[in-house]
Amino acid sequence: MEGHRKVELSEALALGPDWRHACHALLYAPDPRKLFGRIPMRFAVLMQMRFDGRLGFPGGFVDAQDSCLEDGLNRELREELGEAMSAFRVERSDYRSSHIAARPRVVAHFYAKRLTLEQLQAVEARAPQAKDHGLEVLGLVRVPLYVLRDGEGGLPAFLENSFIGAAREQLLEALQDLKLLDPGIIAKLKIPDSK
């Protein structure tokens, strides 16, 4: 979404019928484990490798038969992540933000859903059996929420990847607002320009 800008949900929902709505969700869970026995994981955060080679969040376009944004999002999550998604539902209370882009005329709505680590691991385990696995979705990845001693490995290296639309900005905003990442780490990050 070139030239995307953030808008309020009410403004996004008031746009005319020539606008398409897409919904995506950051799924996360507390993770008490430590990498190599010393680097706290804090949280597990899922993203996916998309068919176009970019990183993004699971979700997709809301269809005419979907009664609301969240129905469309939950349908897309089941298609992309499989039946483990039936154990919970992303609701309006999980809504975070909306971004619009004039070309194409798309509104991207962003949600964040907290799961248990067991629920998140079930999603990861069953995703390869999902309808869209190997097609729209090439695989799931966890976001490394740490910085290695060299100052480049972990999250800084992850952010160098190519992200779709506003996904990088949505990720960083959610990490900060949901307190999934130590604030000191965010302050030290060199955020690459959107690719």
From Swiss-Prot:
Organism: Mus musculus
InterPro entries hit by this protein: NUDIX_hydrolase-like_dom_sf (IPR015797), NUDIX_hydrolase_dom (IPR000086), NudT16 (IPR054754)
Family affiliation: Belongs to the Nudix hydrolase family. NUDT16 subfamily.
Location relative to the cell: Nucleus; Nucleus, Nucleolus; Nucleus, Nucleoplasm; Cytoplasm
PANTHER family the UniProt entry points to: NUDIX T16 FAMILY MEMBER, U8 SNORNA-DECAPPING ENZYME
Subunit structure: Homodimer.
Residues given in the record as Mn(2+) 1 binding sites: 59, 80
Molecular functions (GO terms): 5'-(N(7)-methylguanosine 5'-triphospho)-[mRNA] hydrolase activity; cobalt ion binding; dIDP phosphatase activity; dITP diphosphatase activity; IDP phosphatase activity; magnesium ion binding; manganese ion binding; metalloexopeptidase activity
CDD domains per UniProt: NUDIX_U8_SnoRNA_DE_Nudt16
Residues that hold Mn(2+) 2 according to the record: 76
Any GO CC annotation of this UniProt entry: nucleus
GO process annotations (BP): chromosome organization; dITP catabolic process; mRNA catabolic process; NAD-cap decapping; negative regulation of rRNA processing; positive regulation of cell cycle process; sno(s)RNA catabolic process
Motif range (Nudix box): 61-82
Protein's name in the database: U8 snoRNA-decapping enzyme
